[in-house]
């Protein structure tokens, strides 16, 4: 807006700018994905078409060009993920702040409380400290996922005040809690190149992807699990079953052949040693107990 010649005022309730941006991507800041709009939409679990017009007007290529234009060199990593070359989120927020200052954007340390309307149009924003007259207002408050960074749901509340229907937000890109004790027994174990699938209560597969995951003391986490969480609806009301294929490159028949071959060739060794050639070491005793096998 400022680059287009507008006089811009930014209302920021935090004591510093970019508080949430600085912790994204584990502090590295995954700024976008280097792919087409169609590819981006294909990875949005629900109602991706709603974002089409916005993404077409400002594509990931536009975002990359903008950031590099204000002095943030970028790199593309596995999965088309784009990061600053420095691997430092503060470089991104710092460059944005400098650009704001150069364009004369005014920063007010204040929280927006409500939108003021006159004759059917928004005329001002009411802050906690004062009123801000405005010819146009952009709501860019974030969601409600991390209140400590300022994402407290203010945008939902102000939009609802103006008559918009708000769909109840649900967690996405989050770890999952499991009631299976095996998870705690294998906490810290990371799995790579596995196939994770999720089935709903009717047995329908709602998610299935290859990648990496991690067992924790409360359940499972890691890239695959975070992606899966976006596909699991209303988990406070429903349960889901997760299946992990440790050898996705092998068919069930091929895997059985390999297991039988290992058992024949290592008939003088105990089961734990035999399975160690097929499973991660820390998983073997857990699986033996689960299956009632003597290690």
Go through each PLM region and give its residues.
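Rossmann-like dinucleotide-binding cores of NAD(P)H-dependent redox enzymes
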Residues: 73-97, 162, 166-187
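Glycine-rich loop(s) and the adjacent beta-strand/alpha-helix scaffold that form part
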Residues: 136-182
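An anion/pyrophosphate-binding glycine-rich loop and adjacent beta-alpha core
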Residues: 15-17, 22-23, 31, 38, ...
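Feature captures the FAD/FMN-dependent oxidoreductase FAD-binding
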Residues: 53-136
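N-terminal glycine-rich dinucleotide-binding loop that anchors FAD/FMN and/or NAD(P) in oxidoreductases
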Residues: 19-54
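General beta-strand structural signal in soluble alpha/beta enzymes
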Residues: 10-12, 75-76, 107-109, 139, ...
């Amino acid at each position: 807006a400022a680059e287009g010649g507008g006089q811009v005022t930014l209302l920021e309730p935090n004591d510093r700018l970019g508080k949430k941006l600085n912790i994204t991507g584990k502090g590295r800041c995954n700024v976008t994905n280097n792919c087409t709009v169609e590819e981006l939409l294909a990875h949005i679990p629900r109602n991706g078409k709603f974002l089409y017009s916005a993404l077409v007007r400002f594509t990931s290529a536009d975002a990359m060009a903008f950031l590099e234009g204000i002095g943030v060199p970028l790199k593309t990593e596995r999965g088309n993920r784009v990061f600053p070359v420095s691997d430092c989120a503060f470089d991104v927020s710092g460059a944005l702040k400098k650009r704001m200052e150069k364009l004369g954007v005014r920063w007010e340390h204040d929280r927006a409380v409500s939108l003021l309307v006159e004759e059917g149009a928004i005329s001002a924003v009411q802050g906690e400290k004062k009123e801000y007259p405005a010819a146009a207002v952009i709501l860019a408050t974030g969601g409600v996922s991390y209140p400590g960074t300022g994402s407290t749901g203010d945008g939902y509340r102000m939009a609802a005040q103006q008559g918009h229907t708000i769909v109840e937000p649900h967690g996405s890109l989050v770890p999952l809690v499991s009631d299976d004790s095996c998870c705690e027994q294998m906490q810290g174990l990371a799995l790579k190149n596995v196939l994770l699938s999720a089935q709903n209560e009717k047995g329908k597969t709602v998610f299935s992807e290859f990648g990496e995951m991690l067992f924790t003391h409360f359940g499972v986490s890691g890239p695959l699990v975070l992606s899966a969480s976006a596909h699991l609806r209303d988990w406070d009301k429903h349960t889901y079953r997760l299946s992990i294929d440790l050898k996705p490159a092998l068919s069930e028949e091929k895997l059985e052949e390999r297991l039988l071959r290992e058992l024949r060739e290592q008939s003088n060794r105990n089961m734990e040693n035999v399975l160690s050639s097929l499973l991660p070491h820390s998983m073997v005793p857990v699986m033996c107990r689960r299956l009632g096998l003597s290690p």
